[in-house]
Amino acid sequence: MGTGFHGTTILSIRKDDKVVMIGDGQVTMGNAVVVKSTAQKVKRLSNGKIISGFAGSTADAFTLFERLESKLEAHPGQLLRACVELAKDWRTDKFLRRLEAMMIVADARGTLILNGAGDVIEPEDSVAAIGSGGNYALAAAKALIVHASDLDAFQIAEAAMKIAAKICVFTNENFTVEVIDCASKECS
């Protein structure tokens, strides 16, 4: 992966009336140096109604957050449409095409994965994960959903991320968590 900044794990779980997005805090330069262990890679957008997490270059991710915010302002309450419009720009714009990042975005109604190839993917099983530890977190979360059904969305997300952090050297346990509670006014 060269000497650029990389490495992260973002996981989103949708269970019962909650959507949980969790991300680790590690920023790594190259394959050998941790330059920050408390980065915030999960944030709220659109006046708190949408949660998003990114993997990849931090500067690129902030550019994408800004672009997504403008698409959400142009298409209020339409997460899918805003994401499709962002994906179109991402794929066709000379500058954006060079951005190296992936995002998971979620609102009360759905969860989407966006990537630089212009894909907008709705994950199966209400679980999505990206980043270097994404496959580990995804597998752990799916196993916990099936075999530990008494756990809530937050408990599943936290346990799955702890497993990913033990396996992926680019993921740590300094988690940032955002939750959408669909049983509250937050989803109105």
Swiss-Prot record:
Q: Enumerate the InterPro entries for this protein.
A: ATP-dep_Prtase_HsIV_su, Ntn_hydrolases_N, Proteasome_sua/b, Proteasome_suB-type
Q: Name one GO cellular component term.
A: HslUV protease complex
Which residues bind Na(+) per the record? 165, 168, 171
One of the GO BP terms on file: proteolysis involved in protein catabolic process
Q: Is Oxidoreductase one of the keywords UniProt gives this record? A: no
The active site lies at 8
Q: Does the keyword Oxidoreductase apply?
A: no
Q: Which reaction does it catalyse?
A: ATP-dependent cleavage of peptide bonds with broad specificity
Control of this protein's activity is summarized as: Allosterically activated by HslU binding.
Cellular location of this protein? Cytoplasm
Q: Mind telling me which PROSITE patterns this protein's record contains?
A: PROTEASOME_BETA_2 (PS51476)
Q: What is its EC number?
A: 3.4.25.2
Named from the GO MF annotations, one term is: metal ion binding
| Alphabetical UniProt keywords | Allosteric enzyme, Cytoplasm, Hydrolase, Metal-binding, Protease, Sodium, Stress response, Threonine protease
Q: What is its main location?
A: cytoplasm
Q: What sections of the sequence does the record tag as coiled-coil?
A: none
The Swiss-Prot or TrEMBL record describes its family as follows: Belongs to the peptidase T1B family. HslV subfamily.
What does it do? Protease subunit of a proteasome-like degradation complex believed to be a general protein degrading machinery.
Supply the NCBIfam families for this chain.
Answer: ATP_dep_HslV, PRK05456.1
What binding partners and quaternary form does the record give? Answer: A double ring-shaped homohexamer of HslV is capped on each side by a ring-shaped HslU homohexamer. The assembly of the HslU/HslV complex is dependent on binding of ATP.
- Quote the protein name from its UniProt record: ATP-dependent protease subunit HslV
Origin species, per record, is Neorickettsia sennetsu (strain ATCC VR-367 / Miyayama)
